[in-house]
Amino acid sequence: EISCSLVGSEMCIRDRFNADTFFNDCHPQLKADFIMANPPFNLSGWGQDKLLDDVRWQYGTPPAGNANFAWLQHMIWHLAPNGRIGMVLANGSLSSQSGGEGEIRKNIINADLVDCIVAMPSQLFYTTQIPVSLWFLAKNKKQKGKTLFIDARKLGTMVTRKLRELTDEDIKRIADTYNAFVDGTLKDEKGFCAVVTTQDIAKQDYILTPGRYVGIEEQE
């Protein structure tokens, strides 16, 4: 038995078998105010053929070879009317056009759900070198029709030859940037952050790679 506390909520995990969220949604009626998730990256063979007409695929059926947009839509399905998501996904989800992923991403963007995308630095994980980004989505965004892009790939400090960590200052910089965006006071910073309208994202074929929008850092 494993007991733990997360953000003030107690959980107890007893089952020794792995769960399957797609086929056995343990909380089918849940509408959450906040969701945090770090699902498996680029999972293939997740059972798409048995879930083709699932109600969770509001923005398009995810491809059989990659569950990234299945995870994303599962979380969106469980959001409350003012709910928010913070999620880690492999960078491929920002730009992939294969298996209908580009169309799903387009539909999610046009639904005005994407609040912020943060490109993270490499070597943050012990077990994989897959580059990742943070997706922040919201059902009732304060900044309508706009998305914040942050390129944080240069942040962090190497604590071993293979592992990088974000410092408290790095985390504060990202958080302060997001908070300024929500407040409507943020100014774009070349090479680091930019606020982009949905119309301008559409002009970029609905690709969400931050580097495409923040530009190159100005040299002194």
Task: List PLM regions with ranges.
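A conserved structural/catalytic subdomain of Rossmann-like adenosyl-cofactor enzymes
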Residues: 23-220
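Single conserved hydrophobic/aromatic residue that forms the stacking wall/gate
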Residues: 1-8, 13
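Conserved SAM-binding strand-loop segment of SAM-dependent methyltransferases
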Residues: 14-19
